[in-house]
Amino acid sequence: MKRHLNTCYRLVWNHITGAFVVASELARARGKRGGVAVALSLAAVTSLPVLAADIVVHPCETVNGGTLVNHDNQFVSGTADGVTVSTGLELGPDSDENTGGQWIKAGGTGRNTTVTANGRQIVQAGGTASDTVIRDGGGQSLNGLAVNTTLDNRGEQWVHGGGKAAGTIINQDGYQTIKHGGLATGTIVNTGAEGGPESENVSSGQMVGGTAESTTINKNGRQVIWSSGMARDTLIYAGGDQTVHGEAHNTRLEGGNQYVHNGGTATETLINRDGWQVIKEGGTAAHTTINQKGKLQVNAGGKASDVTQNTGGALVTSTAATVTGTNRLGAFSVVAGKADNVVLENGGRLDVLSGHTATNTRVDDGGTLDIRNGGAATTVSMGNGGVLLADSGAAVSGTRSDGKAFSIGGGQADALMLEKGSSFTLNAGDTATDTTVNGGLFTARGGTLAGTTTLNNGATLTLSGKTVNNDTLTIREGDALLQGGALTGNGSVEKSGSGTLTVSNTTLTQKAVNLNEGKRKLTAVCSHQTRIGNLDAHLI
């Protein structure tokens, strides 16, 4: 017997439905008071571990505990507390063909429900479910309101049109689908991205075909916004990501990633330290702000407008993209194959493609300017730690980090200085004069070295075919590598300062090869002449 308010309730046998039902003490069985009806061995009934089929919880009634199995139904217009639901999904997730489960009807409330394997809780319009735990493949279908639902181990929540989920927590392998017209607020997503950034995985995490507001995406969490979906005020931490095919507004990247695909739109995105926004071909972003150590990447065919690039923020793009905004130099743009006033630092990069141009480019520490064969960049300003990638088929002019002018054009490279990470390729028939390599890579595919070519600590000179040196190749303090091909002509190779010059699989035909200081390591080398200038210098 169950007491609620001032009324007693009993389980009585319904001869019409052939099942036990909850009844008031005033209810009659075949014209008799309920006290007579309970003579049907009530003790045996209450010892059963499951509720009877088709239990009805009427308005103002409260039922505590119980288990639904084997296509049992519980229809709740009152309150059901602590029920375990293990039936209702036998025919597949969110299928109308299913029978059984717990039905929270208009005005009804389900509290502290546990939905397990094959279990289903249906919250109809006007119904409310709170503090539900869904696990092991169980599901919750919402046309009403669900508050503080937890999805564990393949637990699923389907928010239909008119339904609302507030405060859902999606743990490992959990899955929330917000369908068109559905709303989810305050969701915490802890799963979906275990396979890595933007891996093909749609079996866990949050899928948005309706509206998602104030979602928090933690490590391993993923939110996928379908073309019909919209997300607002999303917070994404490191290891979490958001895939946008629809709309994303006011997203904050605190180390997390946002990928905007063809047809997708992102507005008012804030990229903080280690955050990364990627605009793919056909994707669009507006009003993105890049703060220090944040990164905006706009791929070929992508578009980002009204970008604010603050000091220390990184822009990664090419002249095949469209990007406009402001940086510390003022307004900048990359439009129709022309880039102007771009700042590259902290992982920023600009690729200038063949037939395209860049003007007034600033390349500071951690920034990279890549000018492809047939591309042109003028008024380039290289700062300390800036990286230049080019070959002798490009056209480049500007100043080095030490303030000296350099240029590439017409098959002639003058006064290049290649910092660590930089690379220059000298094509056959072209000439490089007075090149300095400070930890970068200088590749000569034939051509001629003129003036003084200097290799400093960490530098590599790679030869392919025959390269002519009629002047001086000097290796100063530190270690350097000369490898491959052949170096011919009437020039000289000079090693000075401490460190080791490694010469590997290279044929040297020079007027002189002088090891004045340090060490030289030879591997499969033919040398016309070698002279050791002092007793401290030696071959190894």
What residues fall within each predicted segment?
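Beta-strand-rich extracellular passenger or scaffold domains
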Residues: 42-44, 48-540
